[in-house]
């Protein structure tokens, strides 16, 4: 199949008939063709252009600038999409907003595990790990990422959660160690 002369689907079906697992079939294809990796692109200036006369936007920018002066570097946030949550448009909008406020922003790839997100946050030396949750995995994944950060000795990294989070779950997330939870209508500048 690697030369492109045969139908991959037919070959995969035949392999399954011969008792190959889906994982084995996928691994064989990945070894030959590689794994798709989505490119993460963000834009700058869009949020700041729309919010330039907003009081909370200006206040958040001033706070970010003051942080930079005090700490010798800009505040750094990582936006993580963990588990099976592939809804990344909102996370990209949030990332753009934070960048326009003066933050250094890292965006994790889609479908990270809690361990992978924590590792990236530690390696990138972020101040804040923002978990974007739109698929209901917050009660499992957020405690896991907080525990993974603790295992790295980095419980100083603040964890915030944004997305479609039922109000009744907020207390659970706070008890797990989250410092803030933001719903869908929250202004980005108010979260900074």
Per-range role (PLM):
Residues 82:
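Conserved ATP-binding TGD loop and adjacent catalytic N/P-domain core of P-type ATPases
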Residues 18-58:
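Terminal amphipathic helices with adjacent charged low-complexity linkers/tails
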Residues 76-78:
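Conserved beta-strand elements of the Class I
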């Amino acid at each position: 199949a690697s030369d492109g002369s045969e139908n991959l689907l037919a070959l995969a079906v035949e392999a399954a008939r011969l008792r190959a697992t889906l994982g084995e079939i996928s691994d064989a294809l990945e070894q030959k063709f590689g794994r798709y990796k989505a490119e993460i692109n963000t834009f700058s200036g869009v949020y700041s252009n729309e919010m330039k006369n907003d009081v909370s936007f200006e206040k958040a920018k001033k706070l970010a600038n003051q942080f930079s002066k005090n700490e010798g570097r800009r505040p750094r946030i990582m936006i993580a999409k963990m588990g099976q949550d592939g809804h990344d448009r909102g996370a990209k909008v949030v990332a753009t907003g934070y960048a326009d406020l003066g933050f250094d922003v890292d965006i994790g790839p889609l479908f990270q595990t809690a361990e992978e997100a924590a590792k990236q946050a530690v390696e990138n030396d972020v101040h804040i790990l923002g978990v974007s949750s739109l698929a209901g995995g917050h009660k499992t994944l957020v405690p896991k990422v907080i525990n993974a950060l603790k295992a790295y000795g980095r419980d100083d990294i603040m964890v915030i959660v944004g997305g479609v989070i039922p109000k009744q779950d907020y207390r659970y997330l706070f008890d797990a160690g989250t410092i803030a939870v933001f719903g869908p209508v929250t202004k980005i500048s108010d979260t900074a």
